[in-house]
């Protein structure tokens, strides 16, 4: 559907460009015919022609309407940004000359209808952090089902998988309300069982985060070479993928799973992998390549001396590195 929509809009824009090329000639022919048929109104016709917009739109009502929308939209910064996100390349691998799209929309917030209340200055929480939260879970009729203060690792899903993902991105002291779709009411605990045929309302307050190693969104740039409206990867889910780490200062490749011939099999939130891996995978749709620019310190593991990807000693912690993730297969 996404490719079809992109194709339709591309065709409309190309159609409009063609009309821009040929409309001056059509205007001249029309002017000559009008002048020959009625010489007495030459001055009036000329004045009318000079006052007309330079673009002449032909076709049926639908074509003219869509063309006007495209033209007017491209005159604004918002319109240009819209088409930048819609008219994306449909190729797979990235290289520096390819066109990529900066990721602006958090699909996870949309999926869970998350609303954030209050503010905090410690965080944000990432998949793999140990958090202490107070939560309330109700049915859609606001009947309270479960209420507790609990400490757990994000991604372990001791209550329900959806709750872990609602907490991602929170600051200590913030509160969130969300709706957990039935599919994400599953958990890894035998103590709390939710019926996965129903949606649930969740209210949660974040009380603490450990360890206090954070990925700040303003220090990281994330780009995708393809976008699609699909269910994204979530904290606690398993995925296979290829990863490549490049040092931006000299182009040296520090790690390349494809060159090794061995894909990475990872549960998002596994603290034996670099923190930036879980951060980048959270909310990713499993198509195309995701490119992440971040400092070397974010490639350290979260509270573990074991790093399955790259040794801490070889990491240039204060330099920016490029991480490329692709060839996704969700387990």
UniProtKB/Swiss-Prot annotation:
Enzyme class: isomerase
EC number in record: 5.2.1.8
Domain annotation PPIase FKBP-type: ranges: 128-226
One Gene Ontology biological process: protein folding
Residue numbers spanned by region Disordered: 33-54
Known catalytic reactions: [protein]-peptidylproline (omega=180) = [protein]-peptidylproline (omega=0)
The UniProt record lists the keyword ATP-binding: no
Pfam family, any one: FKBP_C
Origin superkingdom: Bacteria
Keyword vocabulary terms for this entry: Isomerase, Rotamase
Entry-linked PROSITE patterns: FKBP_PPIASE (PS50059)
InterPro entries: PPIase_dom_sf (IPR046357), PPIase_FKBP_dom (IPR001179)
UniProt GO MF annotations: peptidyl-prolyl cis-trans isomerase activity
Protein name stated in the entry: Putative peptidyl-prolyl cis-trans isomerase RC0542
Native source species: Rickettsia conorii (strain ATCC VR-613 / Malish 7)
Taxonomy of the source species: Bacteria, Pseudomonadati, Pseudomonadota, Alphaproteobacteria, Rickettsiales
